[in-house]
Design a protein with these regions (language model features):
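Walker A (P-loop) phosphate-binding motif
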Residues: 40-107, 198-201, 344, 350
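Short, high-confidence coil segments that cap the C-terminus of an alpha-helix
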Residues: 86, 146-150, 165, 249, ...
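Short, flexible loop segments at boundaries between secondary-structure elements
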Residues: 281-286, 316-342
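Phosphate/Mg2+-binding loops and adjacent switch elements
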Residues: 94-218
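A transmembrane-helix-recognition feature enriched in membrane-embedded lipid enzymes
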Residues: 2-56
Length: 352
């Protein structure tokens, strides 16, 4: 685990510059770029198929490897659409889960079976969430179970052209595109700007950009993030920040199994939390009793994404709740795209 974390940290630094490490990896990035271009062209030629479903599909993803705030963006979008009276569902591959079956993620679904991010999305929105190896299969299963669903939000999948999309939302942070190179020499999963693949619904006219950092560029909508009014215990009670100074007389220690743990630790400190120790874990890390034993005795603070896995071993742990607020102009633009996509398939019965 330590080697993996060290390697990830080294690559994250290398991806911000075209230095020695990035240049050494460039030949592999060139080969990867060729494969990406070939796959895209196969969809254009019809040799690989894109399939539609009878609902509007909004794909929310990122071209940057690592966390940029994609899942909080999904939650914000789903919550807004629900507030507008829309019937919304979510599909995902459920990265890191042990099962490959197509299934609905419910409140009692084990995180290991449904995936930590789908579990978090369902908990936050109560929307139907389906996971499968094929996003198209997940979307069909969702529509079969909930046939009145109007809009499907796809958690990740910008590069998965098998499911036709009506709208794309691409999420960035202050790193933007790093050194501008593709993996593994740079942080990009795909070329940017992304080439159009009209047959799959992927074109710049249907694309919205979100920046979760502090310095959005022109054309990007800003998302502001905070940790809310305090932390949550296993019963859902809020523990205000002011009470954490001497919480249970134990030292406060934070852990995070996310793409960029340092960002979470810094947000805790900005809320006045004095951390005696931090433990950075790989993204989607499967918690085990000995993982937490290394921190004891202490009061554990974890991310909302990790909470269910941590509470399985320590019911006293406290969880953060990430609050992300998108500017109103983003939702105005999203609504315009929805109206444009709405007419060919669904009757406009909401008056929007």
């Amino acid at each position: 685990m330590r080697f993996r974390l060290t390697l990830e940290a080294t690559l994250q630094r290398a991806w911000m510059h075209r230095g020695v490490v990035a240049c050494l990896l460039w030949p592999m990035a060139w080969a990867y770029s060729g494969l990406v271009r070939l796959r895209r062209q196969l969809f254009r030629w019809g040799m690989l198929k894109t399939q539609r479903v009878p609902a509007i599909v909004i794909v929310v993803g990122n071209v940057m490897a690592g966390g940029v705030g994609k899942t909080p963006s999904v939650i914000s979008i789903v919550g807004h659409l629900q507030a507008q009276g829309r019937k919304v569902g979510v599909v995902s591959k459920g990265y890191g889960r042990q099962s490959k079956a197509c299934l609905e993620v419910l409140a009692d679904t084990m995180v290991s079976m449904g995936g930590d991010e789908p579990h978090l999305i369902h908990k936050a929105t109560h929307a139907p969430v389906f996971v499968a190896q094929s996003r198209w299969e997940a979307a069909n299963a969702l529509l079969h179970r909930y046939p009145d669903t109007e809009i499907i939000v796809c958690d990740d999948g910008l590069q998965d052209y098998t499911l036709y999309r009506d709208i794309e939302v691409c999420v960035f942070d202050d790193r933007e595109c790093g050194n501008g190179w593709l993996l593994p020499a740079g942080p990009l999963r795909d070329h940017w700007p992304r080439p159009q693949v009209a047959v799959c619904g992927a074109n710049t006219e249907k694309q919205l950009l979100i920046n979760t950092g502090k310095q959005p560029k022109a054309g990007q909508f800003q998302a502001q993030r905070s940790l809310g009014d305090g932390l949550k215990d296993i019963q859902g009670n809020t523990v205000p920040w002011s009470k954490l100074t001497h919480w249970n007389g134990l030292p406060l220690k934070a852990l995070a199994g996310i793409a960029r743990p340092a960002v979470f630790f810094q947000m805790l400190r900005e809320n006045g939390v004095v951390l005696a120790q931090t433990l950075a874990l790989p993204d989607h890390f499967d918690m085990a009793p000995d993982t937490l034993a290394a921190l004891q005795p202490c009061q554990i603070i974890c991310t909302e994404k990790d909470a269910s896995k941590v509470w399985a071993h320590d019911v006293s742990a406290l969880s953060s709740v990430l609050v992300q607020t998108l500017e109103p102009a983003f939702f105005d633009a999203l609504q315009q795209h929805i109206v444009s996509a709405h007419a060919p398939r669904l009757s406009l019965h909401h008056g929007h």
